[in-house]
UniProtKB/Swiss-Prot annotation:
UniProt source species: Thiobacillus denitrificans (strain ATCC 25259 / T1)
Comment on bound cofactor: Binds 3 Mg(2+) ions per subunit.
Transmembrane segments: none
Major localization class: cytoplasm
Descriptive protein name: Lysine--tRNA ligase
Assigned EC number: 6.1.1.6
GO MF, any single term: tRNA binding
Database matches in Gene3D superfamilies: Bira Bifunctional Protein, Domain 2 (3.30.930.10), Nucleic acid-binding proteins (2.40.50.140)
Length: 501
């Protein structure tokens, strides 16, 4: 069914003025926004339960329904009209006529506009074309829309407008609604997996006296009553580890983090993370656990461990690759030798040649990581754990017992994006204090993302943290993967936008 209106397009201000006039008349006649309509049925459920029934079977059953929704389409044909109502579960056609609905009710219905919310009571039947339809016995206007829907109801053509006016995108775009329904299922599947493995879900502070738990710039705010500076959290890590110190040996949190950094297809300053910590585990176990969690979530969201992302087939059902930084660079760039990748001067010369930024005070490990990020990270399309990160860039991770210059840390990459970051936790209070001091020195040398010294966290560690493993998973990026979405803005209902011009 299509909208048959062939009249010239009206100026939006004129349309709004006409709708306001209609609303004024409705107010004059009685209650303009009633709230006593009792909805009993949903379009999707009716389609599921009755969509396959024959015309004759529906006529024999005479199924009474009472449904409400937004009017998306309308076709007036003299003594009868058809409309399509949309609710959260789907769409259904409605048939309004002088004979059954009543002349006055039908005439009022003709004056209603697309976008209005309508309540209908009637019986189900099928048209000659086999479309499930409600034959309306009564119709009521429940809420008047003053602004028109996007033209032709094909959705918003302007991508930025979709993000700024997400409500219109959700009204007119089935794919957008499907993405956010799937996002909810993904988060539900993660919760089920974690609680099924004995983890306790917790909530930790969103405002911190000291920013910590990640290398990032924080948002700063001020508490008036306490007259103190506070920071929106960049990560919950240090508070979650305090809980492990306190005896909660298996904890997780799904919540927002805030980082005062740039916008991109992969970055939003407000984003969702899941972090979990388990006592008496180390990073190799965490990789197995993270792999199993992502498989479980993929099946819950898509029904398969083989998914398509932007034209690439991603296989989540086979063991994820595990490579060191140097091994990964060598796998995708065999022209580079191990000797070159272990040569600080060679690496800095490469950065100069490729005009890439690097931190001059970094040691060999930091330079190798930067080289990996510049040359190889984007090539990790299939799931790959990069392991054994340098200690100098991992201030919260436990050092290797045999190679103290590296840590028991991994990052998981899929489609060239970091999906997870985990490690055996550093539980040596004295080593952690020294690592914090190294971060302080780096900050004093100009590294804005270096961490602060957190004396209270050191005090907690001094009470004893058992051997512990922890991992953080980017929920938004995981949702991007499992919904085939190219931008993080496509999976956040209201992403951060620049000011409108």
């Amino acid at each position: 069914m299509t909208d048959p209106t062939n009249a010239p397009a009206l100026d939006e201000n004129q349309i709004i003025a006409e709708r306001r006039a209609k609303l004024a008349a409705i107010r004059e006649a009685g209650v303009a926004f009633p709230n006593d309509f009792e909805r009993r049925d949903y379009a999707g459920r009716l389609a599921h339960e009755h969509g396959d029934k024959s015309k004759e079977a529906l006529e024999a059953e005479a199924v009474d329904v009472q449904l409400a929704g937004r009017m998306m389409l309308k076709r007036v044909m003299g003594k009868a009209s058809f409309a399509t109502l949309q609710d959260m579960s789907g769409r259904i056609q409605v048939y309004v006529s002088n004979d059954l609905t009543g002349l006055d009710a039908h005439e009022a219905f003709k004056r209603w506009d697309l976008g209005d919310f309508v309540g209908v009571s009637g019986t189900l039947f099928k048209t000659n074309k086999g479309e499930l339809t409600i034959q309306a016995k009564s119709v009521r206007l429940l809420s008047k829309a003053l602004r028109p829907l996007p033209e032709k109801f094909h959705g918003l053509a302007d991508q930025e407008q979709k993000y700024r006016q997400r409500y219109l995108d959700l009204i007119t775009n089935d794919d957008a609604r499907s993405t956010f329904v799937r996002r909810s299922k993904i988060i539900q599947a993660i919760r089920e997996f974690m609680t099924g493995h004995g983890f306790l879900e917790v909530e930790t502070p969103m405002m911190h006296p000291i920013p910590g738990g990640a290398a990032a710039k924080p948002f700063v705010t001020h508490h008036n009553a306490l007259d103190m500076e506070l920071f929106l959290r960049i990560a919950p890590e240090l508070y979650l580890k305090r809980l492990v110190v306190g005896g909660f040996e298996k904890v997780f949190e799904i919540n927002r983090n805030f980082r005062n950094e740039g916008l991109s297809t992969r970055h939003n300053p407000e984003f969702t993370m899941m972090e979990f910590y388990e006592a008496y585990r180390e990073y190799r176990y965490l990789m197995d656990f993270t792999e199993a969690l992502i498989r479980h979530t993929a099946v819950a969201a898509t029904g398969s461990t083989t998914i398509s992302y932007q034209g690439s087939t991603i296989e989540l059902g086979t063991p994820f690759d595990r490579l060191t930084i140097v091994e990964a660079v060598r796998k995708y760039h065999p022209e580079y030798t191990v000797e070159q990748l272990n040569d600080r001067d060679w690496l800095t010369a490469q950065f100069t040649a490729m005009k890439a930024k690097y931190r001059e005070h970094d040691g060999l490990g930091g330079l190798q990581l930067t080289f990996f990020e510049e040359t190889t990270e984007a090539l990790l399309v299939q799931p790959t754990f990069i392991v054994d990160y340098p200690a100098e860039v991992s201030p919260l991770a436990r050092r290797s017992d045999t190679q103290p210059e590296i840590t028991e840390r991994f990052e998981l990459f899929i489609t060239g994006r970091e999906m997870a970051n985990g490690f055996s936790e550093l539980n040596d209070a004295e080593d952690q204090a020294e690592r914090f001091m190294e971060q302080v020195r780096a900050k004093e040398a100009g590294d804005e993302e270096a961490m602060h010294y957190d004396a209270d966290f050191i005090r907690a560690l001094e009470h004893g943290l058992p051997p512990t493993g922890g991992c953080g998973i980017g929920i938004d990026r995981l949702v991007m993967l499992l919904t085939d979405s190219p931008s993080i803005r496509d999976v956040i209902l209201f992403p951060q936008m620049r000011r409108e011009a």
